[in-house]
Amino acid sequence: MRERFQYNKAIVMFYLNEVLLKEEMPARARRLFIETFRKYHKLDGGDENIALHLAFKAVERRYVKLNNRWI
């Protein structure tokens, strides 16, 4: 069971890095995104789409996207 957990965690973190690189967020926005994602995503059965949506909403509340950059 522990091996499965570690494997899933690695996949999720790789996916998050891919999303964050594409978005080019400032460091604080990235931290907010990751913390929110982790809060709403349960590795053993959580819905990634819902966690991603809520994480983006949290960033959108504090930052504005202008010319494909978060400020």
From Swiss-Prot:
Which Pfam families does this entry report, sorted A to Z? ChaB
What InterPro entries does the entry give? ChaB (IPR009317), ChaB_sf (IPR037205)
Write down the superkingdom of origin: Viruses
Stated name of the protein: Uncharacterized protein in LEF8-FP intergenic region
Q: Which organism is it from?
A: Lymantria dispar multicapsid nuclear polyhedrosis virus
